[in-house]
Amino acid sequence: MKTLILLAITSLFSLSLTAAEKEAVALFNGKDFTGWTQKGGVAKYTVKDGVIVGTAVAGTPNSFMCTEKLYGDFVLEYEYLCDNRLNSGVQIRSNMFAKDTTVDLGNGKTRKIAKGRVHGYQVEIDPNKPDRMWSGGIYDEGRRGWLFPGQHGGDAARFTATGVKTYKPGKWNTVRVECRGDSIKTWLNGVPRADFKDSLTAKGFIGLQVHGIGGKKELVGAQVRWRNLVLKELK
Protein backbone atom coordinates (compact mmCIF):
# COMPACT_ATOMS: atom_id res chain seq x y z
CA MET A 1 0.00 0.00 0.00
CA LYS A 2 2.80 2.41 0.92
CA THR A 3 4.41 1.69 -2.44
CA LEU A 4 1.15 2.47 -4.27
CA ILE A 5 0.71 5.71 -2.34
CA LEU A 6 4.30 6.73 -3.10
CA LEU A 7 3.79 5.97 -6.79
CA ALA A 8 0.59 8.01 -6.81
CA ILE A 9 2.30 10.99 -5.17
CA THR A 10 5.22 10.73 -7.59
CA SER A 11 2.82 10.59 -10.53
CA LEU A 12 0.91 13.65 -9.35
CA PHE A 13 4.17 15.54 -8.79
CA SER A 14 5.33 14.66 -12.31
CA LEU A 15 2.02 15.80 -13.77
CA SER A 16 2.32 19.05 -11.83
CA LEU A 17 5.80 19.67 -13.25
CA THR A 18 4.59 18.84 -16.75
CA ALA A 19 1.71 21.29 -16.39
CA ALA A 20 4.11 23.97 -15.19
CA GLU A 21 6.41 23.35 -18.15
CA LYS A 22 3.50 23.71 -20.56
CA GLU A 23 2.86 27.20 -19.24
CA ALA A 24 6.11 28.39 -20.81
CA VAL A 25 5.52 29.84 -24.29
CA ALA A 26 7.73 30.88 -27.17
CA LEU A 27 7.42 34.64 -27.70
CA PHE A 28 8.61 34.36 -31.30
CA ASN A 29 7.27 31.92 -33.89
CA GLY A 30 10.58 31.69 -35.75
CA LYS A 31 9.08 32.89 -39.04
CA ASP A 32 7.73 36.43 -38.82
CA PHE A 33 6.80 39.21 -36.40
CA THR A 34 3.24 38.13 -35.68
CA GLY A 35 2.46 39.41 -32.16
CA TRP A 36 5.22 42.02 -32.33
CA THR A 37 5.38 45.67 -33.39
CA GLN A 38 8.29 48.05 -33.92
CA LYS A 39 8.49 51.21 -31.81
CA GLY A 40 10.90 54.13 -31.59
CA GLY A 41 13.47 54.30 -34.38
CA VAL A 42 13.62 52.64 -37.78
CA ALA A 43 16.49 50.18 -37.41
CA LYS A 44 15.98 47.10 -39.57
CA TYR A 45 14.55 43.92 -38.05
CA THR A 46 14.47 40.70 -40.05
CA VAL A 47 14.08 36.97 -39.47
CA LYS A 48 16.71 34.52 -40.68
CA ASP A 49 16.81 30.80 -39.89
CA GLY A 50 14.53 31.24 -36.88
CA VAL A 51 16.61 34.09 -35.48
CA ILE A 52 15.59 37.74 -35.00
CA VAL A 53 18.25 39.99 -36.54
CA GLY A 54 18.45 43.68 -35.65
CA THR A 55 20.60 45.83 -37.95
CA ALA A 56 21.87 49.30 -37.05
CA VAL A 57 21.14 52.21 -39.40
CA ALA A 58 22.38 55.79 -39.25
CA GLY A 59 20.39 58.82 -38.13
CA THR A 60 17.67 57.12 -36.08
CA PRO A 61 17.08 56.89 -32.32
CA ASN A 62 16.90 53.66 -30.33
CA SER A 63 14.63 51.13 -32.01
CA PHE A 64 12.59 48.41 -30.31
CA MET A 65 10.77 45.34 -31.61
CA CYS A 66 8.10 44.87 -28.95
CA THR A 67 5.55 42.27 -27.96
CA GLU A 68 1.96 43.37 -28.39
CA LYS A 69 1.07 41.59 -25.16
CA LEU A 70 1.97 43.06 -21.77
CA TYR A 71 3.57 40.97 -19.03
CA GLY A 72 3.82 41.47 -15.27
CA ASP A 73 5.28 38.60 -13.23
CA PHE A 74 7.26 36.15 -15.35
CA VAL A 75 10.43 34.22 -16.05
CA LEU A 76 11.99 35.11 -19.40
CA GLU A 77 14.86 33.27 -21.03
CA TYR A 78 16.61 34.08 -24.30
CA GLU A 79 19.91 33.90 -26.14
CA TYR A 80 21.67 36.78 -27.84
CA LEU A 81 24.68 37.29 -30.11
CA CYS A 82 25.84 40.88 -30.47
CA ASP A 83 28.47 42.71 -32.51
CA ASN A 84 30.99 43.76 -29.87
CA ARG A 85 30.88 47.35 -31.12
CA LEU A 86 27.19 47.69 -30.30
CA ASN A 87 25.26 48.41 -27.13
CA SER A 88 21.85 46.76 -26.95
CA GLY A 89 19.34 45.35 -24.49
CA VAL A 90 15.97 43.74 -23.85
CA GLN A 91 13.16 45.83 -22.41
CA ILE A 92 10.94 44.29 -19.71
CA ARG A 93 7.83 45.77 -18.10
CA SER A 94 8.18 48.65 -20.54
CA ASN A 95 5.65 51.08 -21.98
CA MET A 96 5.07 53.88 -24.47
CA PHE A 97 2.60 56.74 -24.00
CA ALA A 98 0.32 58.14 -26.69
CA LYS A 99 0.87 61.67 -25.38
CA ASP A 100 3.43 63.54 -23.30
CA THR A 101 3.07 62.28 -19.73
CA THR A 102 4.64 63.31 -16.43
CA VAL A 103 5.40 60.32 -14.22
CA ASP A 104 6.10 60.16 -10.50
CA LEU A 105 9.53 58.63 -9.91
CA GLY A 106 9.20 58.69 -6.12
CA ASN A 107 11.15 60.66 -3.53
CA GLY A 108 9.53 63.85 -4.77
CA LYS A 109 10.94 63.46 -8.29
CA THR A 110 9.01 63.52 -11.56
CA ARG A 111 9.94 63.17 -15.21
CA LYS A 112 8.15 64.18 -18.38
CA ILE A 113 8.18 61.36 -20.91
CA ALA A 114 7.51 62.35 -24.50
CA LYS A 115 4.81 60.59 -26.49
CA GLY A 116 6.16 57.67 -28.46
CA ARG A 117 9.18 57.27 -26.17
CA VAL A 118 9.81 53.67 -25.11
CA HIS A 119 10.65 53.63 -21.41
CA GLY A 120 11.14 51.08 -18.66
CA TYR A 121 13.49 48.44 -17.34
CA GLN A 122 16.15 47.23 -19.77
CA VAL A 123 18.32 44.14 -19.35
CA GLU A 124 21.64 45.41 -20.66
CA ILE A 125 23.70 43.96 -23.50
CA ASP A 126 27.10 45.63 -23.15
CA PRO A 127 30.20 45.49 -25.36
CA ASN A 128 32.87 43.28 -23.79
CA LYS A 129 35.23 45.95 -22.45
CA PRO A 130 37.47 45.67 -19.37
CA ASP A 131 36.47 49.12 -18.09
CA ARG A 132 32.71 48.36 -18.16
CA MET A 133 30.95 45.11 -18.91
CA TRP A 134 27.47 45.39 -17.46
CA SER A 135 25.55 42.81 -19.48
CA GLY A 136 22.73 41.50 -17.32
CA GLY A 137 22.51 44.78 -15.44
CA ILE A 138 19.32 46.85 -15.38
CA TYR A 139 19.07 50.28 -16.99
CA ASP A 140 15.86 52.32 -16.69
CA GLU A 141 15.42 53.42 -20.30
CA GLY A 142 14.01 56.93 -20.70
CA ARG A 143 13.55 57.51 -16.95
CA ARG A 144 16.13 57.11 -14.17
CA GLY A 145 19.22 55.61 -15.78
CA TRP A 146 21.22 52.85 -14.14
CA LEU A 147 19.47 50.89 -11.40
CA PHE A 148 21.84 47.91 -11.00
CA PRO A 149 24.65 48.56 -10.70
CA GLY A 150 23.56 52.00 -9.65
CA GLN A 151 20.69 53.39 -7.60
CA HIS A 152 19.64 49.98 -6.25
CA GLY A 153 23.07 48.60 -5.43
CA GLY A 154 25.82 46.57 -7.03
CA ASP A 155 29.51 47.43 -7.04
CA ALA A 156 30.38 48.68 -10.54
CA ALA A 157 33.95 47.36 -10.63
CA ARG A 158 33.00 43.95 -9.26
CA PHE A 159 30.02 43.77 -11.63
CA THR A 160 32.35 44.43 -14.57
CA ALA A 161 34.91 41.86 -13.42
CA THR A 162 32.24 39.16 -13.12
CA GLY A 163 30.75 40.17 -16.46
CA VAL A 164 34.07 39.87 -18.29
CA LYS A 165 34.58 36.36 -16.86
CA THR A 166 31.01 35.28 -17.61
CA TYR A 167 30.40 36.71 -21.07
CA LYS A 168 31.23 34.63 -24.17
CA PRO A 169 32.61 36.99 -26.85
CA GLY A 170 31.45 36.15 -30.36
CA LYS A 171 29.18 33.37 -29.11
CA TRP A 172 25.56 32.96 -28.07
CA ASN A 173 24.98 34.08 -24.49
CA THR A 174 22.01 32.99 -22.36
CA VAL A 175 20.00 35.34 -20.15
CA ARG A 176 17.37 34.54 -17.55
CA VAL A 177 15.13 37.25 -16.10
CA GLU A 178 12.75 36.79 -13.19
CA CYS A 179 10.18 39.46 -12.33
CA ARG A 180 8.00 38.72 -9.33
CA GLY A 181 6.21 41.57 -7.57
CA ASP A 182 8.79 44.27 -6.91
CA SER A 183 11.69 41.83 -7.28
CA ILE A 184 13.83 41.80 -10.43
CA LYS A 185 16.63 39.27 -10.88
CA THR A 186 18.85 38.39 -13.83
CA TRP A 187 21.40 35.72 -14.73
CA LEU A 188 23.99 35.67 -17.53
CA ASN A 189 25.08 32.20 -18.63
CA GLY A 190 23.81 30.86 -15.31
CA VAL A 191 25.71 33.39 -13.18
CA PRO A 192 23.64 35.81 -11.00
CA ARG A 193 23.81 39.45 -12.12
CA ALA A 194 21.15 41.96 -10.99
CA ASP A 195 19.06 41.41 -7.85
CA PHE A 196 17.01 44.28 -6.43
CA LYS A 197 13.52 45.55 -5.66
CA ASP A 198 11.70 48.34 -7.50
CA SER A 199 7.98 49.02 -7.79
CA LEU A 200 7.77 51.84 -10.34
CA THR A 201 6.29 49.67 -13.10
CA ALA A 202 4.47 46.39 -12.58
CA LYS A 203 3.58 45.46 -16.16
CA GLY A 204 4.60 46.17 -19.73
CA PHE A 205 5.87 44.79 -23.02
CA ILE A 206 9.08 42.94 -23.88
CA GLY A 207 11.24 44.84 -26.37
CA LEU A 208 14.39 44.01 -28.35
CA GLN A 209 16.60 47.07 -28.73
CA VAL A 210 18.83 48.14 -31.58
CA HIS A 211 20.67 51.10 -30.09
CA GLY A 212 20.94 54.30 -32.10
CA ILE A 213 24.40 54.90 -33.59
CA GLY A 214 24.07 58.57 -34.45
CA GLY A 215 26.35 59.44 -37.36
CA LYS A 216 28.89 56.65 -36.77
CA LYS A 217 29.11 55.31 -40.32
CA GLU A 218 31.43 52.50 -39.26
CA LEU A 219 28.56 50.97 -37.24
CA VAL A 220 26.03 50.94 -40.09
CA GLY A 221 25.09 47.31 -40.70
CA ALA A 222 26.30 46.07 -37.31
CA GLN A 223 23.91 43.45 -35.93
CA VAL A 224 22.46 41.97 -32.78
CA ARG A 225 20.60 38.65 -32.82
CA TRP A 226 18.12 36.93 -30.52
CA ARG A 227 16.76 33.40 -30.45
CA ASN A 228 14.88 30.97 -28.20
CA LEU A 229 12.82 33.64 -26.43
CA VAL A 230 10.69 31.71 -23.94
CA LEU A 231 8.46 33.22 -21.26
CA LYS A 232 6.53 31.66 -18.40
CA GLU A 233 4.01 33.86 -16.62
CA LEU A 234 3.98 33.54 -12.85
CA LYS A 235 0.79 33.52 -10.82
What are these regions (language model features)?
Residues 4-13:
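Sec-dependent N-terminal signal peptides
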Residues 19-235:
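Carbohydrate-interacting regions of secretory-pathway proteins
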